[in-house]
Regions:
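C-terminal and inter-domain tail/linker signature
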Residues: 1-182
């Protein structure tokens, strides 16, 4: 806590977990954050941007959901499922001390991976208009780690329609062009 300003705050944006002030943050870290990370938790720094009063980290974060993780999945019992996500942390520094930290991740991706959100379950009001919810699972962070690991634009039906038309146009133009060597 010595590395924090008098009234710091931390906000895990998707779940509104964290706290305001040293007392709340100490309780949050001691009871809900540090001990709640499963033993399988792995984190890898992917990039860091440093500004005059901010540090922004992009991280790979994974774990097997073998225990409750209150800061990420409040009140959700363990599912024994693997979770892989990208986390972004924005830390604001004032006078060399932590003023606030905002942590972002794709909560829909987490819920898909643990089986709490099924992309195929479209609300009645969207049936006939939408085949699946536009959410991804672990493939989203895998694409961050390796851009060739997953196809881009897989959820865009029109992308594939345009690609087929472009391929047909390319085939047509190839058939109608003369070689300069002729």
């Amino acid at each position: 806590m010595a590395t924090m300003v008098a009234r710091p705050y931390v906000n895990h944006v998707p779940t509104l977990t964290g706290g305001i002030g040293k007392k709340d943050l100490l309780r949050f870290y001691d009871e809900f954050f540090i001990p709640s990370n499963p033993p399988s938790t792995r984190m890898k720094l992917l990039s860091r941007t440093i500004g005059s009063d901010r540090v922004v980290d992009e991280m790979y974060f994974s774990f097997k959901h073998t225990q409750e993780v209150p800061w990420m999945l409040p009140n959700v019992p363990p599912t024994d499922k693997e979770v892989e996500i990208a986390l972004v942390s924005v830390v604001c520094i004032r006078g060399g001390k932590l003023y606030h930290e905002h942590i972002y991740w794709d909560q829909a991706s987490v819920l898909v991976q643990i089986g709490l959100l099924d992309p195929k379950l479209v609300p009645d009001s969207f049936k006939g208009k939408l085949d699946r919810l536009p959410v991804a699972g672990a493939e989203s962070v895998r694409k961050v780690m390796d851009e060739d690991s997953e196809p881009s634009n897989d959820m865009l039906d029109a992308w594939w329609d345009d690609e087929n038309e472009d391929a047909e146009d390319a085939d047509d133009s190839a058939d109608n062009t003369d070689s300069e060597d002729d």
